A protein has these predicted regions:
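Glycine-rich, N-terminal phosphate-binding loop and its surrounding beta-alpha-beta segment
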Residues: 64, 103-107
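A short, small-residue-rich loop immediately preceding and capping a beta-strand
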Residues: 107-129, 141-144
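Glycine-rich, highly charged phosphate/nucleotide-binding loops
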Residues: 93-102
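Catalytic or ion-coupling anion/metal-binding cores of large enzyme and transporter domains
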Residues: 1-45, 49-51, 57-77, 82-83, ...
Length: 564
C-alpha cells in the first residue's frame, strides 16, 4: 500500500495527539487510514462571485469520499474587485492573489495533505489558486465556480459593466435616475462571477487551455446544477491522480501550456490582467514567461470571440453553443493551441477537445473568418513603456491615438476631474504612482474608465496608467506600464501638455519629447515616500516585483520535501 504523505500526521505512537485532534473533528479509524485531500474555496459573503462554491464544495467532498479519500475543507480570502473598486480597498485586490497562494501553501504543507481541489470565483482567486496548486505540486484540480447569468432591463441584456457605465451616462444627462436604478437592480440577477469575458471568465478559459481543470466546464453558469456533477467528478478524478502519482501541476504547466493560455486570451478578447497572471503562474512552475512572451502569442492569435466588453455576447452564450471547447478546438485546428499539451486526466488537450462543436460564426467565429487577424489584446513597447504595457484592442474603432498629456498623481485625482467632466476630447489622461510598488497594489481603474465611456468619451480620450484595468474596461486604455512611475519609470517624467502617440496596430507607445529635455527631467526627479509604512501593504510593497514578470513576491518555484 502506498504511503501517503499525510501519514506523517496520522501514523505512529507519537501521533496520538494528532489523531486526537482529528477525532475531535469526527474522523474515525477508517477516515484516518485514508489519504487526506484538501478542498479549498472562498465561500462566504464577500462577493456574489464565490457564493456558488457552497454546493459545489459539498459535491467535491462527496466525490472524494466515494473514491476512497478523506476530504478536508478549508477556506481562504477573497477581495471583491467590484466592491473594492475606485477606493483604497482596491489596493488589496492583487495582493490577495499572493495571499491566496501563500495560504494554500501553508495549509497543504502545514497539514500534509496528499492532494488538492481548489475552487475559484472572483478575479484574483483563479490565478491565486492555480499558483498555490503549482507551488505545492501535489495532485490538484482547479474548478471555477461559474459566472452569473446576464440580466435584462428595457429589452437589453446586461452585465455589471452596464451599471458602471450608466453612472457616467447619468452624469451627462444621457439617462435618467430611474434608468440608472433599473440597471443597478437588474444587471446581476444571480450569484456567480461577472458574466462577460472579464477577468474571471478569461482566467477560467485559461485554466482549460492550460489543462489544469476538467474539459469544457468553465462556461457552465454558476447556478446550474450541472456544476455539482462536475465537482463530484473532480473529487473522483483527484483520487485517481493520487493513485497514479499525477500528472502533477508542474508536469502540466509547461511553456506550451502557458502559450495555450495566452492564445485563448487573445482569441476571446479577454482580460488584460491575464498578461499579469500568466507570468506569475509561470514563475511558480520555474518558467520565465514574461509579458514579452505573452505579447508574442497575442500578436499571432486571431480574435474569434464576439464577447463583452469588446463584443456582444456573454459566458452564457458561449455555454449555449458548446462551451470553451468550441474555442479550444478551433485554435488547435488552426495551430494556435498546442494539442499535444497534457491535462489533469493524463490525456492531451487534443484528445479532450477533439469532439467539440465547430464555431457558430456569431458568438465564436472561425479562425478563417476572424473578427480581427491580430488578437484582441496587445502588448505595447516604446520610450514611455520600455518594459511593456497592455491594451485591449477588441472593439476599438481606431487603434491610433495622439494627444496632449493631462497628468494625475493618483486615481482619485483623475476620477474627480472626470466626475466634473473637467477634461477634453483629444487628451491623454495619465494616472501614475498606481503600480505594484507605488500604489501599492496596482489598483484597477474600471471606475474611471467606465465613467469616461458612459459619458460618451470612451474613444475620444486615451488613458494611460501604471495601474491595472478590470477585464470589463474598454476604450483607448493602456495599463501595466512598466517600469512604474514610483520606481523612476518614464511615466514619472511626463508633464501636462506633452505629446503622446499610441499606435496599438504597431504595438508602440511613445512620449514625443526631446531626449535632452527628458534627461533634464530625470536629473530633477525625486522618488516619492512610500504610502504605507506598516501593515500588509507595506510588506507587499517591499517584496513585489514589476508587471512584466507578473508582479510576484518571490522568484522561482518553491521546493518542499515529500515525506518519507
Amino acid at each position: 500500500m502506498k504511503k501517503w504523505r499525510s501519514r506523517v500526521t496520522t501514523d505512529g505512537l507519537d501521533r496520538a495527539p494528532h489523531r486526537a485532534f482529528m477525532r475531535a473533528m469526527g474522523l474515525d479509524d477508517a477516515a484516518l487510514a485514508k489519504p487526506m485531500i484538501g478542498v479549498v474555496s472562498m465561500k462566504g459573503e464577500q462577493t456574489p462571485c464565490n457564493m456558488t462554491h457552497d454546493f459545489q464544495v459539498d459535491a467535491a467532498k462527496s466525490g472524494i469520499a466515494e473514491a476512497g479519500g478523506t476530504p478536508r475543507e478549508f477556506t481562504t480570502v477573497s477581495v471583491s474587485d467590484g466592491i473594492s473598486m475606485n477606493h483604497e480597498g482596491m489596493k488589496f485586490s492583487l495582493f490577495s492573489r499572493e495571499l491566496i497562494a501563500d495560504s494554500i501553501e501553508a495549509v497543504v504543507h502545514g497539514l500534509a495533505y496528499d492532494a488538492l481541489i481548489g475552487f475559484g470565483g472572483c478575479d484574483k482567486t483563479l490565478p491565486g489558486v492555480i499558483m498555490g496548486m503549482i507551488r505545492c505540486n501535489v495532485p490538484s484540480i482547479f474548478i471555477y465556480g461559474g459566472s452569473a447569468l446576464p440580466g435584462r432591463f428595457d429589452g437589453r441584456t446586461l452585465t455589471v459593466l452596464d451599471s458602471y457605465e450608466a453612472v457616467g451616462g447619468f452624469m451627462t444627462g444621457d439617462i435618467d435616475e430611474a434608468t440608472l436604478e433599473g440597471i443597478e437592480r437588474s444587471c446581476l440577477p444571480t450569484i456567480g462571477a461577472c458574466a462577460g469575458q472579464f477577468t474571471a471568465n478569461t482566467m477560467a478559459m485559461v485554466s482549460e487551455a492550460m489543462g489544469v481543470t476538467m474539459a469544457n466546464v468553465s462556461m457552465i453558469p454558476g447556478v446550474f446544477a450541472e456544476r455539482a456533477q462536475v465537482a463530484r467528478q473532480a473529487g473522483r478524478l483527484v483520487m485517481q491522480m493520487l493513485q497514479r502519482d499525477g500528472p502533477l501541476p508542474r508536469e502540466i504547466v509547461t511553456r506550451k501550456a502557458l502559450e495555450n493560455g495566452a492564445a485563448i486570451v487573445a482569441a476571446t478578447g479577454g482580460s488584460t490582467n491575464a498578461a499579469l497572471h500568466l507570468p506569475a503562474i509561470a514563475n511558480e512552475a520555474g518558467i520565465v514567461f514574461t509579458i514579452d512572451d505573452v505579447g508574442e502569442v497575442f500578436a499571432r492569435t486571431p480574435l474569434i470571440g464576439n464577447l463583452r466588453p469588446g463584443g456582444k455576447y456573454t459566458a452564457k452564450d458561449v455555454f449555449d453553443i458548446g462551451g470553451t471547447a468550441v474555442v479550444i478546438r478551433a485554435l488547435i485546428e488552426s495551430g494556435h493551441i498546442d494539442g499535444a499539451s497534457l491535462t489533469i486526466t493524463g490525456r492531451t488537450i487534443a484528445e479532450e477537445y477533439g469532439n467539440a462543436n465547430p464555431p457558430d460564426g456569431e458568438v465564436i467565429h472561425s479562425t478563417h473568418t476572424p473578427i480581427m487577424r491580430d488578437g484582441g489584446v496587445a502588448v505595447l513597447k516604446g520610450n514611455l513603456c520600455p518594459d511593456g504595457a497592455v491594451i485591449k484592442v477588441a472593439g476599438l474603432k481606431s487603434v491610433l491615438f495622439e494627444g496632449r498629456a493631462r497628468v494625475f498623481e493618483d486615481e482619485e485625482a483623475c476620477v474627480d476631474a472626470v466626475r466634473k467632466q473637467d477634461y477634453s476630447a483629444g487628451e491623454v489622461l495619465v494616472i501614475r504612482n498606481e503600480g505594484p510598488v507605488g500604489g501599492p497594489g496596482m489598483r484597477e481603474m474600471l471606475g474611471v474608465t467606465a465613467l469616461i465611456y458612459g459619458q460618451g468619451m470612451g474613444e475620444k480620450v486615451a488613458l494611460i496608467t501604471d495601474g491595472r484595468f478590470s477585464g470589463a474596461t474598454r476604450g483607448m486604455c493602456i495599463g501595466y506600464v512598466s517600469p512604474e512611475a514610483f520606481v523612476g519609470g518614464p511615466l514619472a517624467l511626463v508633464r501636462d501638455g506633452d505629446l503622446i502617440r499610441i499606435d496599438a496596430g504597431a504595438r508602440r507607445m511613445n512620449l514625443l519629447v526631446d531626449e535632452r529635455e527628458l534627461a533634464a527631467r530625470r536629473q530633477a526627479w525625486k522618488p516619492r515616500p512610500p504610502r504605507h509604512r506598516a501593515g500588509a501593504l507595506a510588506k507587499y510593497a517591499r517584496l513585489v516585483g514589476q508587471a512584466p514578470r507578473g508582479a510576484v513576491t518571490h522568484e522561482g518555484p518553491a521546493e518542499w520535501p515529500w515525506f518519507d
